[in-house]
Amino acid sequence: MEPLVETVIEDGRWEELDLPALATRAAEATLAALDMPAEGFTLVVMGCDDARIAELNGAFRQKGKPTNVLSWPSEERASEEPGMAPEPPEPGDPEDPEPLGDVAIAFETCQREAAEQGKPVTDHVTHLLVHGVLHLLGYDHVEEADGDLMEATETRILAGLGVPDPY
């Protein structure tokens, strides 16, 4: 059986926060909240630094500056109706799980934002990982109604993890 989350650590500082455990916990909670079987899916989380995420942000979003988290869904899953939850993907089987996509998260930006917001960095990272996984599942915040849905979904998932409402 493949693990739900494959973690790639490009910046060793992520090991201090135990990114693999944070990523697995966030992904499992997100899928469970949406009634999706964790054993039917897989995703990749890369822990990197600001320089690497700025490079990726420039290449994929034409914004050559650091950001906190980026995600690349394996396929388009967004809902056609603003404010409506996207249709969940069909799970694979445990031996051949359905790939959801990739998430990258930047160490310095996460540390800085957590300090600015006066919250534990692990809570902030957990929030951003839930946010990234929701993007892989088709959630977005382009339209106001979609943003409201995504924030409410994040808040519900985070509450189940004991993380206070980030909004």
UniProtKB/Swiss-Prot annotation:
InterPro entries named in the record: MetalPrtase_cat_dom_sf_prd (IPR023091), YbeY (IPR002036), YbeY_CS (IPR020549)
GO-annotated cellular components: cytoplasm
Binding residue positions for Zn(2+): H131, H135, H141
Chief location: cytoplasm
Matching SUPFAM superfamilies: Metalloproteases ('zincins'), catalytic domain
Top-level enzyme category: hydrolase
Localization, UniProt: Cytoplasm
Its EC number(s): 3.1.-.-
Compositionally biased spans, kind Acidic residues: 90-99
The entry's keywords: Cytoplasm, Endonuclease, Hydrolase, Metal-binding, Nuclease, Ribosome biogenesis, rRNA processing, Zinc
Disordered, as annotated region: 64-101
GO BP terms: rRNA processing
Swiss-Prot/TrEMBL cofactor(s): Zn(2+)
HAMAP family membership: Endoribonucl_YbeY
Name used for this protein in its record: Endoribonuclease YbeY
